[in-house]
Amino acid sequence: MRLTYRPELLKRVSDARAFGRVAVLFGGNSSEREISLLSGNAVLEALRSRGIDAHAFDPRDLPLSDLITARFERVWIALHGPGGEDGTLQGALECLGVPYTGSGVMGSAIGMDKLRTKRLALAAGVPTADFVVLQGSADFEPAIERLKLPLIVKPATQGSSVGMTRVERAEDLPSAFAAASSLESLVFAEPWIPGKEYTVALLQGEALPSIRIETPKTFYDYEAKYFRDDTRYFCPSGLGASAEAHLRNLALAAFEAAGASGWGRADFMMDAAGRPLLLEINTIPGMTSHSLVPMAARAVGIDFAELTWRVLETSFTRVPAQQAPARP
């Protein structure tokens, strides 16, 4: 039963029974399993607090076909990393005909790939940092010549800053490349941008207030994102009205360029000239106590339970093709 994406069918739901039986997918097998467990349990508790018939479902332990045999009517995806937010799961759910939250197959796959996101963003007029693809040692010297030191090496399709390394000396580039390429074959380098980091959460086609992030660590890495208590978040971010509006518009444009939808986040660095540069988009952001989307939602009066409800509403845009109403 093939699903089709119909954004015009997005609707506000007032009765929890309208959602039916909901599976919250979390855990999985990626390097971000630990964070997914935190996110999924928080989402599960919040949905149940609103009267939704929600159940835990870990695809590491259960086949996805159990979604059909257990008669789940829709899925709240709280899986992070490869296999969860890269289009793989979304494609499987499309084949099963089970509506799900957030971006579809293409938007998820592109959003997980930082390189393709950057290329599409540039084509859409969204600024992003220069970059060099690293395939081996022959690329090291040209990368340093073009980007200068320090620079940062990134695996293209890992989330939560997994595998990223700041490189200050040329002799450290081989080990940084080895760390990233041990996770995947697509690796690239960017110049180190010493400015401030901002993020913009997106929900149902609207950009929420930006958040400025300050960490005592070298950069906003896995530990700083989820476990440190000395990372500081500012919402309002301190930007003027014009700069704030510009940043939100860039976030929406980047999300649209990648074909992403429903909810998510766009991350930026502000360079020395005050120009925001897109780092990446995230189509299934964390939903933990340290997470940024819940923080931005609170700034506009949306509590955590309401946020999980609003995200679940995005599943109504995925409908079986044969049941979709005729387009006007």
Q: At which residue positions do the language-model features occur?
A:
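ATP-binding N-terminal substructure of ATP-dependent carboxylate-amine bond-forming enzymes
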Residues: 1-112, 116, 123, 133-142, ...
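A short glycine-rich, hydrophobically flanked beta-strand micro-motif that places a catalytic Asp/Glu
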Residues: 55-59, 187, 191, 261-273
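Phosphate-binding site of ATP-dependent enzymes
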Residues: 168-249, 270-277
